[in-house]
Structures are given as C-alpha cells and as structure tokens.
C-alpha cells in the first residue's frame, strides 16, 4: 500500500483532570508512531488548573490549548474538531496510556476503507487484564462491553474515550449532539447516528490502550442532565414506541418535565432533518445488533 500523507488531529476534552492531562500527554509523546499529528486540548472551565502546565514552553509548541466556558463534553469535542487542521480526528479522554504504533494501526483500517470509525480495545489502567472491545446496549439502554473477537469487527457503540474518525464523516452527521449540555450518552448518540447514516463503526482488537476508570466524576453529574440527554437522543432517532419506552427508563425524575424541556429545545426540527438524511431507521439498528429494546 502506498503511504499517503494522512495526518491526525488528536482532541482531548478536559475538565478537572488533575495530573491526568500531563500523564496522558507524556505517554502520547513517548509513544512511537510514523504518523504526523497535532494535539488539541479543550479545557472546559476546569477549576483545578490542570492545564496550566501547558503554558510552559516545553509543552506550548506541541499543544493547541483552547479554553471554553463550561459548554459540556459534547460541544467541547465539537469545538476541538472545528479547530482541527487534519483529515482524521482522534478523540481521546485525558486519562489514557498508549502503546507503540497505536495511531498507525487504527489509521490503517480507515485508509484501507475497512471501516469509517474505529476504536481500540480499552483496558483498565488499574487492572490491564480487564479489557473491553467496543460496546453494545442492553434492554435498558445501558452500556455493555464486547468480549474479544478475532480481527476488526463491527460494534454497535463506539466508546467516546478513544476513537478515530474521518473529519468529513464526523461533520456529515453534525458531530456530537450540540443539544447535550452535560455529560451522558454523547458517545451512544453519535454511534447510533453514524450507523443510521450508513457509516460503519468497528473495534480493532489488535490495538489496546489503557483507560483510567474512575469511581466518580471530577465534576458534578446529575440525573437531570443524563436523563435529558437520554430522552433527547430518543426524540432524535427513535420511533414513538421506543420514545415511550425511553420515558419509562426515567425513574428518579419526572419524565413529563424532562420531556417538556427536550421538546422546548427544538428537538423535532433536528429529528425531521435526520429522518430525511439517514439510510436506516432505529428498527434496523436494534434488530441488526440484536438489542432487545
């Protein structure tokens, strides 16, 4: 295969990550690759000054630091993508450790058109024997990790913690959902949207990165935001029956109240646009991946 000059923009959304940002970048810069890349850090109103070290000259010329005012992880990633210079976008959490040539191996799957989006296997930093290979959903729309399969394979859900996507594919589906103001379901929504628009999402089990699974978030995550995102996702992509089932999953808050908020925010306009432009419907998606919902 003739090597083309594909370059990668690596985008890290950051909020109150403490020493993780520095550790992650140290791992990245020490890891072998033949691929040229840029690093974009979107510091979304961190309160712990975790990105201040990037002002030092040693890091300054290696990293493009963007500061945002608490826009949430979805929009922070989109802002990073808009600033990206290269044709491939690699979204990463700011608490990862890498293996040699991980970027090269992921990029090969896209360059050879084996898939449109790819994630590596993701191991726990605390116990690297625990590894997940892409994700699917259970009957209450909760995440379940796949076991290992030989070779590249399709996955219903791409974990947001580490994945590579062509820039034009990302923007063709409108990026991460701009109506998600807080953390929750942003990778699930993007994955479903990609499949419905006819793009393939895959896991490359030959690449493993380590991810710090945290006991709790370093910033406030509340039920309201998570439920809002869940129901908004349903309104964007699901049929009426599944929208109703999604409302039934809202137990710690008033479903009616959350539904009113979702509808007030103009979700139906975007839904109509998606229904016009997609290649498959939610019925196909849930059947195809054998998700009983």
Q: What is the predicted role of each segment?
A:
Residues 74, 146-164:
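A recurrent flexible, glycine/aromatic-enriched loop bordering the glycosyltransferase active site
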Residues 93-97:
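The conserved acidic donor/metal-binding loop of glycosyltransferases
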Residues 68-84:
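Glycine-rich, basic loop-to-helix element that forms the pyrophosphate-binding segment
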Residues 89:
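Short aromatic/hydrophobic "clamp" motif used to bind/position activated sugar donors
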Residues 101-137:
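Conserved donor NDP-sugar-binding/catalytic core segment of glycosyltransferases
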Residues 43-53, 70:
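A conserved acidic beta->alpha catalytic loop
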């Amino acid at each position: 295969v003739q090597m083309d000059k594909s370059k990668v923009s690596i985008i890290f959304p950051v909020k109150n990550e403490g020493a993780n940002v520095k550790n992650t970048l140290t791992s990245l810069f020490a890891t072998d690759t033949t691929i040229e890349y840029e690093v974009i850090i979107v510091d979304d109103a961190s309160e712990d000054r975790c990105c201040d070290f990037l002002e030092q000259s040693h890091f300054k010329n290696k990293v493009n630091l963007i500061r945002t005012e608490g826009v949430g992880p979805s929009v922070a990633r989109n802002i990073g993508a808009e600033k990206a210079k290269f044709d491939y976008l690699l979204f990463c959490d700011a608490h990862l450790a890498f293996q040699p040539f991980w970027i090269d191996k992921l990029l090969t799957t896209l360059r050879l058109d084996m898939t449109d989006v790819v994630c590596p296997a993701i191991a726990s930093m605390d116990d690297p024997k625990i590894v997940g290979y892409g994700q699917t959903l259970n009957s209450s729309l909760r995440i379940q990790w796949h076991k290992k399969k030989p070779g590249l394979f399709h996955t219903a859900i791409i974990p947001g913690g580490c994945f590579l996507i062509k820039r034009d594919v990302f923007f063709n589906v409108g990026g991460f959902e701009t109506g998600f103001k807080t953390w929750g379901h942003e990778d699930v929504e993007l994955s479903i949207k990609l499949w419905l628009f006819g793009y393939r999402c895959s896991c490359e089990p030959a690449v493993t990165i380590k991810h710090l699974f945290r006991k709790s978030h370093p910033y406030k995550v509340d039920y309201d935001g998570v439920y809002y995102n869940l129901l908004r996702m349903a309104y964007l992509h699901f049929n009426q029956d599944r929208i109703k089932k999604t409302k039934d999953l809202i137990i710690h808050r008033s479903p009616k109240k959350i539904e009113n908020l979702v509808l007030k925010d103009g979700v139906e306009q975007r839904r109509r646009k998606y229904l016009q432009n997609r290649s498959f419907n939610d019925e196909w998606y849930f059947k195809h991946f054998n998700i009983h919902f």
